[in-house]
Amino acid sequence: MILGILQARTSSSRLPGKVLRPLMGRAMILRELDRLKECREITRLVLATSSDPMDDELAQTVEAAGYDVYRGSLDDVLGRYYHCAQRYMPTHVVRLTGDCPVIDPHIVDQVTAQHIAEHNDYTSMTERFPDGLDTEVMTYAALEKAYQEAALPSEREHVTLYIRRHPERFRVGTVDCAEDYGAMRWTVDEPQDFALIEKIYERLYPQHPVFTMEDILTLFREDETLAHINQGIMRNEGLKKSIAAERVL
């Protein structure tokens, strides 16, 4: 069984409550779940949020929409993933994040299929893909090993960091993009990110609700002003801050 775990919380430091912001009349997190529901490789899909009361509304919103919810540690996200996976005992786990409302289910399937075909412990995407399509796949055994061995705060907060830091201990694979679109930013961390996502949905969703990466790229070619809306924001800023904080200590 392949379990898709979408991690999300309400307490974003840069854009609090972003996952519940209305996007074409529906909470952003539900838009992402609706897209992930189209994945053919994922057997079961669950939202993993925290047990903190501030995430009560998030959990209730997602459950009311008919999706499974697991609640665990706020800060030990690796532990939250592992205990969530324990409930379902999958063979593989697909890691997804709640700040990617234009995630492409076809790419999720591509990464998952390659992971299985190559018998990898862990498979990720290169940064040649636009930021906001993030998909990682790992075996349950690899997740368990990371849970048991990861000690640094950054490795508990960022679920797959321990695996990526120890490639000698895992069979690791990557999925590359045919062209380099790494400068494009389709994730939501800042107000200008959400402004861009709103425009993408307004332009594409009415005609094609499950629009793809290629559809967005075509839209950007037709309207070059879109790329300027959220220029200049650092990729993976949260991860870089966590690692920098440990170096200071």
Task: Give the ranges of each region predicted by the language model.
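N-terminal glycine-rich phosphate-binding loop and ensuing alpha1 helix
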Residues: 1-49
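Conserved N-terminal catalytic core of the sugar/cofactor nucleotidyltransferase
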Residues: 30-91
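Short, high-confidence coil segments that cap the C-terminus of an alpha-helix
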Residues: 42, 89-90, 117-121, 170
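Conserved donor-nucleotide/metal-binding helix-loop-beta segment in metal-dependent transferases, i.e.
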Residues: 83, 104-130
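Basic phosphate/pyrophosphate-binding loop/patch that engages nucleotide-derived ligands
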Residues: 87, 110-121, 139-155, 165
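Conserved nucleotide-sugar donor-binding
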Residues: 90, 133-147, 191-195
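Short beta-strand-to-loop acidic/aromatic patch adjacent to the donor-nucleotide binding site
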Residues: 90-100
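Conserved alpha/beta core of the MobA/IspD/sugar-nucleotide pyrophosphorylase nucleotidyltransferase superfamily
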Residues: 138, 160-249
